[in-house]
């Protein structure tokens, strides 16, 4: 047999560079694919865990910022004001032309109402009521709601003070509130200023809308300065109660004490009717007791005349 041919070293040297270059190219491609896969996985992980990672970073930075702020405040410490203060008064009132209801602050914490209840409406002027009869048709009711909302304190420690404030409203009393009208001296020619007070601490100043002018006969008697008979006649004419003009309504809340612990209601028409009667009596008394000038001022006219209305009517 012929001798087997031995591989030549030239052929081996010719084929080795090609095989090495192919292997290097394949390895580089695999490395590139692996790198792309790793980047994709990393992006997916960051996307899934971004919320938790953001919360963790926020907590870490907040702790660091609080520590730095405490270090800055530590050299100059200032006394902090006491947190325990009087609670804010919470009132809700609804007004219309006939009735008014005042509600005390609630004892329990309620949820915040919608934005519609927070809108403050402008109050509409009340329509004048010149009718004396209660049987007639009432005027149009113009409602106006007023509300003021703010947060309640967590520790409602001052609730007792608010309850003490509302305690007189809920007491059961049978005696009606006494009304007092006081005359105050003013310059001649100007209407008298009347002050009406009640046991509830309400005050109202009433001015006559159209005060009756003195008759020319009385002025002539005063200027002429006649005898005693003429003076007596003028005084009688002056003391005669003249019919006062129809006065407009006055908003004087006369709140009766009723057996109600939550709400207190009053009738505005009844208050206006009573006020008209009182103003008529005041006009009559003002004619009977005029304000005299400096030299002729009597000792009795210097004092304030006190008139108490009859509650038996």
Swiss-Prot record:
Q: Where is this region: Disordered?
A: 71-90, 97-151, 243-263, 291-313
Q: Has UniProt tagged this entry with the keyword Aminoacyl-tRNA synthetase?
A: no
Record-level GO cellular component terms: cytoplasm; membrane
Record GO biological process: flagellated sperm motility; sperm individualization
Topology of the protein relative to the lipid bilayer: Single-pass membrane protein
Query: Which chain positions lie within coiled-coil regions?
Result: 263-289
Subcellular location as annotated? Membrane; Cytoplasm
Which UniProt keywords are given for this protein, alphabetically ordered? Answer: Coiled coil, Cytoplasm, Developmental protein, Differentiation, Membrane, Spermatogenesis, Transmembrane, Transmembrane helix
Q: What InterPro entries does the database record attribute to this sequence?
A: SPEM1_N
Biased composition of type Basic residues is found at 107-122
Q: What does this protein do?
A: Required for proper cytoplasm removal during spermatogenesis.
Name of this protein: Spermatid maturation protein 1
> What species does this protein belong to?
Bos taurus
Tell me the name of the encoding gene. SPEM1
């Amino acid at each position: 047999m012929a001798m087997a041919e031995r591989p030549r070293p030239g052929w081996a040297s010719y084929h080795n560079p090609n095989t090495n270059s192919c292997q290097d190219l394949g390895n580089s491609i695999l490395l590139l694919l692996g790198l792309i896969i790793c980047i994709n996985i990393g992006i997916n992980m960051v996307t899934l865990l971004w919320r938790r990672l953001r919360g963790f970073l926020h907590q870490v930075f907040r702790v660091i910022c609080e520590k730095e702020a405490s270090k800055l405040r530590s050299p100059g410490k200032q006394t902090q004001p006491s947190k325990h203060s009087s609670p804010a008064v919470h009132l809700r009132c609804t007004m219309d032309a006939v009735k008014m209801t005042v509600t005390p602050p609630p004892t329990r914490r309620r949820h915040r109402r919608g934005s519609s209840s927070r809108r403050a409406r402008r109050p509409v002027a009340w329509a004048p009521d010149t009718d004396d009869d209660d049987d007639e048709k009432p005027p149009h009711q113009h409602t106006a709601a007023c509300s003021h909302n703010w947060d309640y304190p967590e520790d409602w420690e001052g609730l007792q003070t608010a309850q003490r404030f509302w305690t007189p409203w809920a007491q059961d009393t049978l005696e009606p509130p006494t009304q007092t009208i006081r005359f105050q001296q003013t310059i001649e020619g100007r209407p008298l200023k009347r002050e009406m007070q009640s046991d509830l601490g309400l005050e109202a100043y009433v001015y006559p809308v159209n005060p009756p002018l003195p008759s020319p006969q009385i002025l002539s008697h005063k200027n002429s300065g006649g005898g005693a008979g003429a003076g007596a006649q003028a005084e009688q004419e002056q003391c005669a109660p003249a019919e006062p003009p129809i006065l407009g309504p006055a908003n004087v809340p006369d709140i009766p004490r009723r057996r109600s612990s939550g709400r207190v209601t009053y009738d505005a028409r009844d208050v206006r009717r009573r006020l008209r009667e009182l103003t008529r009596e005041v006009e009559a008394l003002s004619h009977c007791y005029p304000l005299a000038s400096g030299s002729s001022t009597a000792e009795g006219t210097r004092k304030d005349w006190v008139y108490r209305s009859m509650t038996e009517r």
